[in-house]
Design a protein with these regions (language model features):
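Metallo-beta-lactamase
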Residues: 2, 9-14, 19-96
């Protein structure tokens, strides 16, 4: 799903795992992703909460977020930004 905000098109990506309704927002024109609590610098969102799912979280990251360009800058819900390529290479929570 895409929505426009002024000159930006926001792509809403359903990324369940941390929560069933989790989303990430990708701005292709700027090559940035707002990942919320799905993906962090060398980490992932918590899945020990009610209705969260580790399996769904990993699938969301591998099958959706890791399909974005490697140089996509990821702004996380907490902490420092990262890139999709950096996470593919260094995030041991999402290996395999």
């Amino acid at each position: 799903m895409a929505r426009g905000v002024k000159d930006l098109e926001l792509e809403i990506i359903h990324t369940p795992g941390h929560s069933p309704g989790g989303i990430s927002i990708y701005i292709r024109k700027e090559n940035v992703l707002f990942a919320g609590d799905t993906l962090f610098l060398q980490s992932v969102g918590r899945t020990d909460l009610p209705h969260s799912s580790a399996e769904d979280l990993i699938l969301s990251i591998k099958n959706k977020l890791y399909k974005l360009p490697e140089d996509t800058v990821v702004y996380t819900g907490h902490g420092d930004p990262t890139t999709i390529g950096g996470e593919k290479r260094g995030n041991f929570f999402v290996q395999g």
